[in-house]
Amino acid sequence: MTRVSDILTFLETIAPQDLAMDWDNSGFQLGDRNAPVTRVLVSLDPFEDTAREAAEWGAELILTHHPLFFDPIKSITEETAVGRTARLLIQKGISLWSGHTNLDVA
C-alpha cells in the first residue's frame, strides 16, 4: 500500500527541498507521513474549499503549489481561513504537501 511518505520521497526527487528559497515554506505542511494514500487531490492553493472537496472525494493527501502556512503562525482558530482549513484537514485525516519555490526552480 502506498503511504504519504512514499509520495513525499518521490516528490523530493522532482522538487528537492533544498531548491526552495530561504523565505519559503515549501514541503510537508501537515498530516501523517505513515498514513495510507489511495487518492490525491492537486490544487494551486490550499483553500478551505479545497480541503472540503478532498474530504468529500475521499482524498488522503492534497498537493498544492502555494503553502497553507506561509507567515509565522500565531494561532490556529476558527477565526481565520488558515485555521479553519488546518482544522478540517486534521479532523478528516488529510495530509498536505506544498511545492512552491522548490517546484518553480525544478
Residue ranges and their predicted role:
Residues 1-106:
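Hydrophobic structural segments
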